[in-house]
Amino acid sequence: MADPTIDKPSNITPLRDNRLSTAGRPAKPAPAFIFGHDDDSGPELEILGAGTKAASQIAAPQGVDLASKKKIIFWIGRGKTGKTTGIRWSAEAAILDGTTLLMADMDPTNDTFSKYIDNVARPPQASDPVLSLKWLDKLLQHALRHGVSLLVDLGGGDTTLRRLVTELPDLVAMIEAQGFAIVLFYTVGPQEEDLSPLATMEGLGFRPTATAIVLNEAMAEIGDPPENAFARTLRHSAFLAAVERGAVPIWMPRLLPAQQVEIRRLKFHDAAAGEIGQGKTPLGPFDRSRVLNWLQAMDANFAGVKTWMP
């Protein structure tokens, strides 16, 4: 879009040459205009658990080492918080590494994960809470019995895991006794309500050591620094309590051509490689580069919890 034209009011005198005033003295230069600078020029608010200033400056946090463990991994988040993007990235990386794992899509309202990745199981009636609970129960036992890691997509409004935890308050200890570890990735945007799945599960006492809070930069307005967009989230009591007990905050970078990748139904690495998918043309060279840079940024941001992956 072209820059808007601003008409000069007729009663405004044109600016004089700044080099000399009428008296021959140098004129005082006008204050420089920086868009957004005057909106919030105060000092940064000190927030416990948010000791860095911007996503690009945050060092990858180090999580507990789970390299020797099989894992039960849940990605949990409300709609439009980047949950499916995150779990797709995780699944693709595991598949490229040749990792044997089980995958399940239990989001009752969004089955995108199972549409992008092959061999993802899904309950016959994902919207039926009773059948979904039985299905998850049997799926977990199947993974434990066969010693295979499991990757599960749970919707933010899904109550299946919550009801299972209510029935089995010792679920974490029971799974750990089988030589497995439970890993939770909560995806959140700038809305405080996005913390509700985290607050609910933490309130039930479901607090695995390997818990990450994934702050999705794509949910912030373009041009708004992430530390500003997520300020209320970063100082919310639910976030601070989870971080205080050991949860790891991780920034998920924005993928600018996400829609173009989705239109073509492409895996991220295929998009970067110039595959066509269900589209008529591949991504252009700029967007392919953006996807590749995003993949590299994801690897860097999640490096501290690399052993939490399948």
PLM features: what roles do these ranges have?
Residues T109-Q125:
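P-loop NTPase switch/communication element
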Residues G79:
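The conserved Walker
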Residues T85-G86:
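Hydrophobic positions on the alpha1 helix immediately C-terminal to the Walker A/P-loop
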Residues G82:
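Conserved glycine(s) of the Walker
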Residues A2-I73:
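Extreme N-terminal, non-catalytic leader segments
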Residues D97-T112:
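Short beta-strand-centered segment that lines the nucleotide-binding/catalytic pocket of NTP-utilizing
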Residues Q125, V148-V165:
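Switch II (G3) loop of P-loop NTPases
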Residues T160-I263:
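Conserved catalytic-core segment of NTP-binding enzymes
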